[in-house]
Amino acid sequence: MVNNINWVKLPVILDRLLRHPLLTDLNLETAIQYTLDFISAMGLPNVYVDKIETIDIKEYRGELPCDLISINQVRLHKNGIALRAMTDNFNAYPTHDHKEGDWYERGEPSFKTQGRVIFTSIKHEKVDISYKAIMLDDEGLPLIPDNPIFLKTLELYIKKEWFTILFDMGKISPAVLNNTQQEYAFKAGQCNNEFVIPSVSEMEAITNMWNQLIPRVTEFRRGFKNLGDKEYIRVH
């Protein structure tokens, strides 16, 4: 896995694509759409950045960050207690107010999301959301990793999608499209290995997780802070 990622602006990949005579009609808007589709389809964790944002919960709900892709974890801002996923079908729509300290408030706090809204089991609170987002530049355009394998794979993906349209219109032969599809298939596998295979440090943390005699059942509450620590056995 790539440990250190530098970022470049999307026009870099667009300039490379426009060198091809069959891609001269490609514009920035289309390139952005294909880039977001590619990032979503590949699901590479290092392509996203981790962010933490504190939001206000009012009347059991709050507004999620606009750049949120997926939620890592949610916790209460005041004491760091983690919220689990909501399992109550009616928890997000309570029929009456609950006083602080009653049986309802003493249960485990929970949350669920619908669209750009987060619902919690607590009426008024501040929560910290750890989430993954796409890296953006000052103009709000997505930044992409400055990695030669990633750039080539993205270039072939956009080329493949554009050539599919040209093939449907009868402007290119099947051999041209098949060659691009084959190139992309091989490069996609290489890109996946480049970004998914753990580094030596990550392998050490994974090994420590597996080699445990006593299961750690409280790591969720701590945000998995100590999950990768080595377990020591004291012999008295």
Curated annotation (Swiss-Prot):
It comes from Bacteroides phage crAss001. GO terms for cellular component: virus tail. Forms the tail multi-ring barrel with ring protein 2, ring protein 3 and ring protein 4. It comes from the Viruses. It holds the Pfam family CrAss_Ring_1. Homododecamer. This is Ring protein 1. Coiled coil: none annotated. It is found in: Virion. Keywords: Viral tail protein, Virion. The barrel is composed of five stacked dodecameric ring structures. Podoviridae-like phages usually possess only one such ring. The tail is thus rather long.
